[in-house]
């Protein structure tokens, strides 16, 4: 399966194919001339796949160096970025060389940020290994790292030269790591794809069902994001729809402590909680919050978080990139398969969170 991201300046393809990881070297060679490659990964994914990917790349004539960092959201910061810069400098990486991001969303976000800023930008590709990364973060060119005060507050827009997705690697994920990716999948069904929502409604929510339908789930999710990114690369309009559930979700991730609530879990919480607010304001139809919550629960996703620290959540919301003065742009779902943007006063948001 192939999806074309037909951007005017940086078009690229998304390849979705079971077993594709075996041919990663040939795929990269179809994009780049043989050169030096920095393979950026974390200690967990690296232990599973780094050597195989390195050998595949070397077989095609690439010189490969591997940068490993400690897995998890807590590593997605400027300290790790600086270590990566020093590694690239030490290994003589130039602007004609490239980066291969091998891992989940943390690896992809960090490696993309490093690639887009090292020497003012070098080429990179994404090889996502988690469901969250395969359906969401590897596509669209958003890169970024966290600070103690806010998630993804430091970042760039930088498109990869390609994305290679092998659904087979999902079989090595733990149950929680697989299920959290369904938070983003549910989001795609809600904002733009009622057929995807229907598929999710029809399957039983088990790990087996997710893996059995993984190619279709990944393809439909990627296609939603592809369409939106092509229409609005730099988030001037409809790309905001992709943030459904993320406003409160990011606040939950931050206040809980990075890594304690996984990203897809936080998105699920955020979707349910913002829908609850929107229902109370009559911006969404009555009963839709219950539908969203039931879908999330079916896949084992959380819909609430304890302890619910309103003051800390409110402070996090004020630091959100979507905050404008005394209000914040939020995404709502007036009906399944359709999204809209609404401006909610921050004080009002706080009042709803307290109830």
UniProtKB/Swiss-Prot annotation:
GO molecular function, one term: metal ion binding
Compartment(s) where it occurs, according to its Swiss-Prot or TrEMBL record: Cytoplasm
Pathway in which the depicted protein is active: Metabolic intermediate biosynthesis; chorismate biosynthesis; chorismate from D-erythrose 4-phosphate and phosphoenolpyruvate: step 2/7
A Pfam family that the UniProt record links to this protein: DHQS_C
Binding-site list for NAD(+): 71-76, 105-109, 129-130, 142, 151
Keywords tagged on the record: Amino-acid biosynthesis, Aromatic amino acid biosynthesis, Cobalt, Cytoplasm, Lyase, Metal-binding, NAD, Nucleotide-binding, Zinc
Cofactor binding comment, as recorded: Binds 1 divalent metal cation per subunit. Can use either Co(2+) or Zn(2+).
Cofactor annotation: Co(2+); Zn(2+); NAD(+)
Lineage: superkingdom: Bacteria
GO biological process: amino acid biosynthetic process; aromatic amino acid family biosynthetic process; chorismate biosynthetic process
Signal peptide: none
Catalytic activity: 7-phospho-2-dehydro-3-deoxy-D-arabino-heptonate = 3-dehydroquinate + phosphate
Enzyme Commission number, as recorded: 4.2.3.4
GO cellular component, as recorded: cytoplasm
Function field: Catalyzes the conversion of 3-deoxy-D-arabino-heptulosonate 7-phosphate (DAHP) to dehydroquinate (DHQ).
Name of the protein in its database record: 3-dehydroquinate synthase
Species this chain originates from: Streptococcus thermophilus (strain ATCC BAA-491 / LMD-9)
